[in-house]
């Protein structure tokens, strides 16, 4: 099914982050399953310290949902109207995603308008 092409494990181009995308009801979510740590600390050491909600600042980054509410747009073949969470800054942004001709996943975080944002490219893990 075309809408589920996004599901699976993905690694960013810099090879510093791996996510797993799955369904949640009719929407899609992504969780962090691995990330590179330059300080040599275990992955479960890192907490969501910059979260604006003080109750969430002790949750671990590993396993955290960083992309939620993505909905498949059948007419465009893209995923839209999602929210991406940037744990480095404790901010949420609008999000969209598509799979390009090379089979890469492009996730775009933006502020209200897609042209005001930043994209990340991921390659599917086998």
Task: Describe the residue ranges of each PLM region.
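A mature extracytoplasmic/lumenal domain signature
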Residues: 14, 23-25, 34, 99, ...
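N-terminal helix-cap/turn-to-beta initiation motif at the start of protein domains
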Residues: 1-9
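Residue-level detector of short, conserved catalytic/binding motifs and their immediate flanks
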Residues: 8, 28, 105, 120
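Edge beta-strand at a domain terminus
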Residues: 102-104, 111-126
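C-terminal terminal-subdomain/extension
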Residues: 94-99, 104-106
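Central antiparallel beta-sheet cores of small beta-barrel/beta-sandwich binding domains
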Residues: 7, 15-86, 90-94
């Amino acid at each position: 099914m075309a809408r589920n092409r996004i599901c699976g494990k993905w690694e960013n181009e810099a090879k510093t982050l791996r996510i797993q995308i799955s369904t949640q009801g009719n929407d899609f979510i992504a969780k962090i399953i691995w990330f590179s740590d330059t300080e040599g600390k275990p992955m479960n050491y890192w907490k969501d310290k910059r979260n604006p909600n003080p109750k969430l600042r002790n949750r671990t980054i590993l396993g955290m949902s960083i992309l939620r509410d993505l909905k498949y747009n059948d007419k465009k073949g893209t995923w839209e109207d999602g929210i991406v969470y940037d744990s480095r800054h404790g901010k949420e942004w609008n999000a969209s995603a598509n799979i390009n001709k090379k089979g890469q996943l492009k996730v775009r975080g933006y502020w209200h308008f897609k042209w005001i944002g930043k994209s990340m490219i991921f390659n599917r893990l086998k």
